[in-house]
Amino acid sequence: MRRAVCPGSFDPITNGHLDIIVRASKLFDEVVVAVLINKSKAHLFTIEERIDLIRDAVRSHPDAPTNVVVDSSHGLLVDFCRVRGIQSIVKGLRAVSDFDYELQMAQMNHSLAGVETLFMSTNPQYAFLSSSLVKEVARYGGDVSGLVPDVVLKGLRDRSAP
């Protein structure tokens, strides 16, 4: 079975993330979305909320894949891959600046565990998009409806409600 992981903090998941996950699901038998736990980072959504948001977003996508599972991970991503028998990491690249960092990570992951990294170019309509940008725009009452799945939009609105 060809298995891949799409890692990230997904705080929150964006339409750009979702696009990469759905596209990866067409290339692999199973795609595991690994929600990375970083306790030193302040998150808007809890790990459980992020997992639920991702599951709901994938399920409600027009091309809803049935081969996507969501899990959480702390520690080294290659250890997560090794324990679960995952051979590939899928990463979306928005710009050349992403490539510099991601290439170093890919080389390290390969040297540590022989895990391959597949880079997918982001759909141009999402090239500027990041979770941080979504949170910033939403924090000031901006419209993020075209940037995140509906379930995330509801979650963001619930967070900003008085």
Swiss-Prot record:
GO MF, one example: pantetheine-phosphate adenylyltransferase activity
Pathway: Cofactor biosynthesis; coenzyme A biosynthesis; CoA from (R)-pantothenate: step 4/5
InterPro entries: Cyt_trans-like (IPR004821), PPAT (IPR001980), Rossmann-like_a/b/a_fold (IPR014729)
Pfam families: CTP_transf_like
Claim: Magnesium is one of the keywords in the record: yes
Subcellular location: Cytoplasm
Catalytic activity: (R)-4'-phosphopantetheine + ATP + H(+) = 3'-dephospho-CoA + diphosphate
UniProt record, GO biological process: coenzyme A biosynthetic process
Binding-site positions, substrate: S9, K41, L77, K91
Keyword tags: ATP-binding, Coenzyme A biosynthesis, Cytoplasm, Magnesium, Nucleotide-binding, Nucleotidyltransferase, Transferase
Similarity comment text for this entry: Belongs to the bacterial CoaD family.
Subunit structure: Homohexamer.
Name under which the protein is recorded: Phosphopantetheine adenylyltransferase
Lineage summary: Bacteria, Bacillati, Actinomycetota, Actinomycetes, Frankiales
